[in-house]
Amino acid sequence: MARSLRKGPFVDEHLIKKVLAAQGNNDRKPIKTWSRRSVVVPEMIGLTIAVHNGRVHVPVSINENMVGHKLGEFAITRTFKGHFGDRKA
């Protein structure tokens, strides 16, 4: 179910403050965040946001194709070790 257009996209307050400050200072340092639920907004384009995946912060470089998606979509939480070979006798 989509979010109402009347409400607008959800972005944690502390994250949007850091984004606006980084844009004002032209700071290229990655912004660390645990907020996987925040939506990528146009103000984030060109910045690098380090999204926590449960273990480490994964650096995500934001481009215009990511607008409207959630930050958590770009930081994979599970590691796939691969399927083992054929074990049939």
Swiss-Prot record:
InterPro entries: Ribosomal_uS19 (IPR002222), Ribosomal_uS19_bac-type (IPR005732), Ribosomal_uS19_CS (IPR020934), Ribosomal_uS19_SF (IPR023575). It comes from the Bacteria. GO terms for biological process: ribosomal small subunit assembly; translation. Transmembrane segments: none annotated. It holds the Pfam family Ribosomal_S19. Belongs to the universal ribosomal protein uS19 family. Protein S19 forms a complex with S13 that binds strongly to the 16S ribosomal RNA. HAMAP family: Ribosomal_uS19 (MF_00531). This is Small ribosomal subunit protein uS19. It comes from Vesicomyosocius okutanii subsp. Calyptogena okutanii (strain HA).
